[in-house]
Amino acid sequence: EYSAMASMRHLQEHVRPTLMRIYRITAEEADFYFRDMWLVVHSLATLIVTNDCPYSDEELARLLTGFSVSIYKAIREIPGFAAGAFDRDAVFRALAGGDEGKAPVK
């Protein structure tokens, strides 16, 4: 029987070493990055296969690049991001200019 999540985990195992090598991240971070990008791609795929996608190929490329860069930047710059062990309020305050420096780890 087909399972989308089992398929995702199978592919994740194959892609993990490449992500770790190219992006210089841990296995946990690679799995986090892959999972989040997989969710974005599958959301867009739903729009495409239902013939309800309002975005051009160029817009889709920009969307995917934006998500990819954002996730990678958060992994690299917010300690504990991939593990979910960070202070979300502090991160948003810092991004909004309320605090100086990087967000502390919980």
Question: Where do the model's predicted regions map?
Answer:
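Hydrophobic alpha-helical segments that form the core
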Residues: 28-50, 62-71, 84-95
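Alpha-helix initiation/capping motif
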Residues: 26-28, 56
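DNA-recognition helix of helix-turn-helix
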Residues: 54-58, 72
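Short, flexible helix-adjacent loops and helix caps
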Residues: 24, 49-53, 79-80
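Charged, low-complexity intrinsically disordered regulatory/assembly segments
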Residues: 77-106
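Amphipathic alpha-helical segments used for helix-helix packing
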Residues: 1, 13, 46-54
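Amphipathic alpha-helical packing segments from all-alpha helical-bundle domains
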Residues: 1-24, 31-36, 62-73
